[in-house]
């Protein structure tokens, strides 16, 4: 029996407030913006929020990063902006909570598998052992999975549907060999192609490889990372129309329900936000993330939740701009 609320690991301290609007990426502010959006849409009651988790100390980051980088970042040294974001002490403090949030969500999914565990965070999957990259400071998913493997002996798979390849796990394997046990080779999955073929790539991996690995005991938990920048109108992504983006969500959450039945118990599942930029309309990013959770509530938890997706067409200058925008709006103003 599944718990009917999404367990959410959110502490306001994981949000960058000061100077947040000067950054190109709004990821440091996204947790707060999403919580506010969910409340505005009357959906926040479906989320059980806890801030009862400890911030990470420097030693936690050393699981996947060099001492030099960790020390340099928290002191505001030369590599403190290698992530492409502005640095200040409050931002440095906030990443202690974002990384602790994803770890806490994954660990909770294992200890309380009836709860869908949610970390409203991003800014992890491009970081490398000796520096940040691509708006990512520390490789939180690599740190979390190594800690979970060391503490609980559990092995995970990441379904990374961000608009960009999640390199941090692969780039950390040589630096931290325990990661090869925590997330085996081939289980940091990033779909290829676009639209229907992108969707099919996800389905083939999940049904053809991941499912058998779970049933055989090779994989213990799954982390779902459905980045909004894999949407076609994100300026830093391109893979999926609204239809195929939401089809991925619908497939995943219905598959989790199917796996619960095959296992005879809840499959440990956690999720995080990952990318999404839309400098012209950030509500479109928040709406995509919300639609993903609506599919979770409907497909997995069997709740009758009403929500109409609000993805606006990106204004593009060139051939057929006006006609494309109008037809795109008709196609994508849909209830999910």
Can you describe what each PLM-predicted range is?
Residues 1-56:
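N-terminal low-complexity, Ser/Thr- and acidic-residue-enriched intrinsically disordered segments
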Residues 29, 33, 56, 65-68, ...:
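Generic alpha-helix structural propensity
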Residues 15-21, 55-59, 78-91:
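Glycine-/proline-rich flexible loop or hinge segments
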Residues 37-38, 62, 222:
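Extended, charge-rich C-terminal regions with high alpha-helical propensity
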Residues 29, 52-56, 64-65, 197, ...:
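Short coil/turn linker and secondary-structure boundary residues
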Residues 12-14, 67, 123-124:
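Short, flexible active-site-adjacent loop segments at beta-strand->alpha-helix junctions, enriched
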Residues 4, 72-336:
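A general "terminal functional-core" signal
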Residues 53-78:
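Charged, often glycine-rich, active-site loop that binds/positions anionic groups
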């Amino acid at each position: 029996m599944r718990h009917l609320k999404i367990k959410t690991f959110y502490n306001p301290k994981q949000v960058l407030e000061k100077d947040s609007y000067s950054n190109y990426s709004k990821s440091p502010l996204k947790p707060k913006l999403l919580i506010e959006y969910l409340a505005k849409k009357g959906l926040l009651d479906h989320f059980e929020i806890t801030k009862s988790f400890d911030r990470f100390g420097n030693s936690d980051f050393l699981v996947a990063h060099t001492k030099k980088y960790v020390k340099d970042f928290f002191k505001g040294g030369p590599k403190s902006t290698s992530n492409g974001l502005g640095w200040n002490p409050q931002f440095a403090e906030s990443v202690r909570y974002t990384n602790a949030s994803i770890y806490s969500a994954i660990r909770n999914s294992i200890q309380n598998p009836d709860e869908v565990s949610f970390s409203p965070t991003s800014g992890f999957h491009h970081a490398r052992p000796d520096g940040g990259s691509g708006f990512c400071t520390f490789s939180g998913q690599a740190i979390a999975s190594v800690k979970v493997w060391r503490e609980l002996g559990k092995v995970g798979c990441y379904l990374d549907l961000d608009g960009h390849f999640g390199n941090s796990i692969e780039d950390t394997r040589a630096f931290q060999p325990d990661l090869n046990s925590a997330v085996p080779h081939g289980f940091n999955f990033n779909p290829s192609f676009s639209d229907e073929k992108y969707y099919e790539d996800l389905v083939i991996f999940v049904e053809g490889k991941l499912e058998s690995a779970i049933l055989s005991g090779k994989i213990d938990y799954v982390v779902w990372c459905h980045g909004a920048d894999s949407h076609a109108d994100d300026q830093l992504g391109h893979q999926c129309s609204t239809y195929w983006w939401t089809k991925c969500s619908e497939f995943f959450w219905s598959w989790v329900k199917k796996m619960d039945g095959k296992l005879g118990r809840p499959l440990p599942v956690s999720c995080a936000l990952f990318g999404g930029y839309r400098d012209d309309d950030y509500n479109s990013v928040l709406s995509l993330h919300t639609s993903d959770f609506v599919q979770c509530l409907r497909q997995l938890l069997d709740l009758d939740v009403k929500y109409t997706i609000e993805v606006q067409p990106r204004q593009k200058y060139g051939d057929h701009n006006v006609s494309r925008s109008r037809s795109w709006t008709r196609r994508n103003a849909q209830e999910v």
